[in-house]
Design a protein with these regions (language model features):
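Local sequence-structure signature of Cys/Sec-based thiol-disulfide redox active-site neighborhoods
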Residues: 1-27
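ATP/adenylate-binding site constellation spanning eukaryotic-like Ser/Thr protein kinases
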Residues: 11, 51, 70
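Short alpha-helical
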Residues: 15, 41, 72
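Class I S-adenosyl-L-methionine
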Residues: 18-21, 25, 47, 74, ...
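Thiol-based oxidoreductase modules, predominantly thioredoxin-like and allied folds used
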Residues: 30-42
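Structural micro-motif
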Residues: 50-58
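Non-catalytic, surface beta->alpha helical segment in thiol-disulfide oxidoreductase systems
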Residues: 61-84
């Protein structure tokens, strides 16, 4: 699976969000970054898709990884065979 439909929900000042962005950027993943503090509809979408409001949250198709660190992100990408 490619990363073409990858959405990363973030909030300003979130250190784990920055770590997630660096991880994805360094490995060449393409993703849409959405700041849920600037977009109320995106915040509601985040809650609907993930059942919570924590960031970072990564959504790829039907796969959702909420509130994660780099180890969980790496495992998630490998498990779902998501390539840059």
């Amino acid at each position: 699976m490619s990363s073409n439909s990858m959405i990363l929900y973030v909030k300003p000042g979130c250190p784990w969000c920055r770590v997630a962005e660096l991880y994805l950027d360094e490995r060449g993943y393409r993703y849409k970054r959405i700041n849920v503090r600037q977009d109320r509809a995106a915040y509601d979408e985040l809650k609907q898709k993930s059942g919570q409001a924590y960031t970072p949250t990564l959504v790829i198709g039907d796969h959702v990884l909420p509130d994660f660190g780099p180890d969980e992100l790496e495992e998630f990408l490998k498990e779902h065979k998501i390539l840059p």
